[in-house]
Amino acid sequence: MAGALAAVMVFTLAGCGTEKKDTKTGKTVSGEKVTIRILENDTAKKSGYLEVLIKSFNEAYKDKGIEAVDANMEEYTDLATNGPYGYGPDVIYQANDQIMTYAEDKHILPVEVDKLDCYEQIPKIAWDAYRIVVDGKTYYCGVPVNIQEPMLFYREDMLPENWQTNWDKDGNGTPDFFENWNDLYAYSESLRECDTSATGTEKYGFMQSLYDPYLASSFYLSYGAYIFGKNEDGTYNAADIGFSKNNAANGLKALKQFAGLMYEGCIDDTITLNRYEKIANGTYFCTVSTPDTYSLFIDKLTLQYENEGISHAIAAKKAEENLKMTELPGLMPKDGDLSKDSAGMTEDDFVNVVVMGGVNGYAISSYTKYKDACIEFVNYATGYDMVSRRTEMLGIAPAREDVAKQTGGMTDMIFKSLSEGKIYLMPSIKAVDQIWVPAQTVLGEVAKDAFNKSTGTEKYVTTEDFQKALETIDRNIYDAIFALAE
């Protein structure tokens, strides 16, 4: 397989496609206009960014015979199934793990990235998310656009009035519950205790779908766990699975503990689906999502303010002012006990938070007839102007250093976190497809166990219990990759 892939890549680097074309104009030899289909994510489409991008590109290339159009396909359309029959997109925008899964199976073309305008502006760690090694030679199969990591979203106008006196022990101007998980737990607990509604379901603190291995990654990666180990050449070793490594059991303790302040919607995707509305109406104090969903929170909050009798213009402005996005609290309790008062804890009692992240970007289908035109589009879409516009419209964290610095604030912080290793990049190998179900199953079971306490039927109590749960994840992932594939 490796030899075949190398042969395909060498061929495609020299050129691909079945129809000859004039690379200077983009037109085919017969003089026809080249039309390339672009598959973007749903957020980019709903926000109007894709329309802006395509219109801008087409204006810039109108004299070169290249036209880009919306592929009009579902965000996660299967390139492997549709591509060979000519139904797939020419250019796709997706996360690094998905693109590289396609790349391993030869559905994506490698790109000479050092010839792109964005090359020098993107850090090596982001490029490496699209790196593949075949027969000792390195290829890159995607172009980074933005950095993804789980972020905390909240409404500034929902902060407690006394946070500066009661929730800022060090007086640094940042609430303690945004700096460490013990205080986030304590504040969330206080909100639950103050919920006097008839149903007791109107006031929650921190809320998230705890079964999600990506969004809940801080509960195991912060304690020394990892997804896959690495070989000497830097490539991932899918046989070395590390969910159970080091002190990850303590992180699972914390996950179960926090689940106890939520409701059973944390064991599935219920909270992921309702988080935009629940943040907007004040039911949730804060929640976890990714930077590219910022506009979805804004839309719901704007609507909330409108429903309170404010005009759309004022509501939109108020939403922009009050919706905040910040990185997750940077400190987790070393022993996994969130109930301890942080006032009595020292620096040695905490571990630094690590989250799973990803790099979303563009890739070119192996089945396109117009590789050169696709490269022109990708080069344009990853240029300074369009990445800046994407950042402005979608609230993304750009992979380009110049745009990150220009934007400043949280965007620059996320860029720095990636460079400093605080973000564990999702492995860019096909085997990553097999981690989700085993991890979701166990994380969901552990979260649900928090609701078994009242009936005396808890399954996960001791450190050994949590360790065995994590070992189950490792074992089931291994079986899915190797034993079941035979």
Question: What are the residue ranges of the model-derived segments?
Answer:
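Glycine-centered hinge/linker elements that transmit conformational signals in sensory
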Residues: Y185-E189, N231-T272, L323-K324, L328-P329
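Short, well-ordered beta-strand elements
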Residues: G31-T43, I66-A71, V91, C141
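Short, solvent-exposed loop/beta-turn-alpha elements that line the ligand-binding surface or hinge
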Residues: E112-K124, E161, T165-F177, A225-N250, ...
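Extracytoplasmic/periplasmic substrate-recognition and gating elements
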Residues: E67, E161, E306-I396
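Extracytoplasmic/periplasmic solute-binding protein
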Residues: D135-V145, P150, N182-D240
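Conserved C-terminal helix/tail region of periplasmic/extracytoplasmic solute-binding proteins
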Residues: V387-S388, E401-T407, K416-E486
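Hinge/lid segment of periplasmic solute-binding proteins
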Residues: A95-N162, N182-Y185, I314, N322-P329, ...
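Extracytoplasmic "Venus flytrap"/periplasmic binding protein-like
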Residues: S56-I125, A129, D157, E161-W167, ...
